[in-house]
UniProtKB/Swiss-Prot annotation:
This is Ribosomal RNA large subunit methyltransferase F. The lineage of its organism: Bacteria, Pseudomonadati, Pseudomonadota, Gammaproteobacteria, Pseudomonadales. It holds the Pfam family Methyltransf_10. Its EC number is 2.1.1.181. The keyword Transferase applies. SUPFAM superfamilies: S-adenosyl-L-methionine-dependent methyltransferases. GO terms for molecular function: 23S rRNA (adenine(1618)-N(6))-methyltransferase activity. Its main location: cytoplasm. It comes from Azotobacter vinelandii (strain DJ / ATCC BAA-1303). Residues 1-23 are annotated as: Disordered. One of its GO terms (biological process) is rRNA base methylation. GO terms for cellular component: cytoplasm. Keywords: Cytoplasm, Methyltransferase, rRNA processing, S-adenosyl-L-methionine, Transferase.
Amino acid sequence: MPSTPRPPTSPAQDPSPLHPRNRHRGRYDFPALIRRHPALAAFVILNPYGKRSIDFADPEAVKALNRALLAEHYGIRQWDIPPGYLCPPIPGRADYLHGLADLLAAEHGGIIPRGAALRVLDIGVGANCIYPLIGHREYGWRFLGADIDPIALASAEAIVRANPGLAAAIRLRRQNDPAHIFQGLLRSDERFDLSLCNPPFHASPEEAVRGSRRKWRNLGKLDPRRKLPLLNFGGQGAELYCPGGEAAFVARMIAESAQFAGQVCWFSSLISKTANLPAARAALQRAGAREVRVVPMAQGQKQSRFVAWTFLDDAARRHWREERRKTPRRETARD
């Protein structure tokens, strides 16, 4: 059995823009992480302020830190991703899930619904499988992770199978048509309490490269003679960019979500660019969303947010919750 995850740091001890339940508030405790996860030691350095850190421009260092954090806080003992795939910052991913938990708690008398009765759809699960891993460990939710990339799905499947207790909680499915998001993916009898998505950020490969160069410049690592590794800043094409970028992808998701209004209680998506919010609100109005929530998030100097929407009114959502309580959990064959 995986070890018991360690509790989050008390907000009183470490003021932080991260969610109060986030286990990564404050600075990483590198001495403690190294004691329990010695492989991380090779990548720990002193930053210009004399504090322990890693070189966040080094893909292997970022992977080593993620492995240690996932093992330390979530009991994930085996985790890896193929070269060139997105290596996400754990704290920000956890914040999205905690924000979604708060959204559900607001409709459950202030109590977060936990356990396998609650189902979540992850659009673009990626090779890292990060949202299902954290969401299941924190709240016991079950996940369906979807992706258009067979290599990413194979990586996510390997992570699930390598860690005891995950196979019954995390299922994976390929979206065979990149032109669609929900259509052709969801079966008519499936229902999800939440959907989540970290959409492609850029509109083209060239824009993605410019974004990577900008991040390297901010880290003081930009060298025009070096080829930029994409690992910790982006990944494969579908992870990095799509025609029209984030705004177009989210608009397409909103339009298509209306066709599945009765199968997902709350849809959601990250929106990294503040400038994309007005277009998302307009798309939601056109689609006929009954309620829209914009939840701000922050990690360090980075400001972000997610937007959540539902096509169900209060009475329909109340009926949804009652049906979930009455309906026994049903297992289906693995995808």
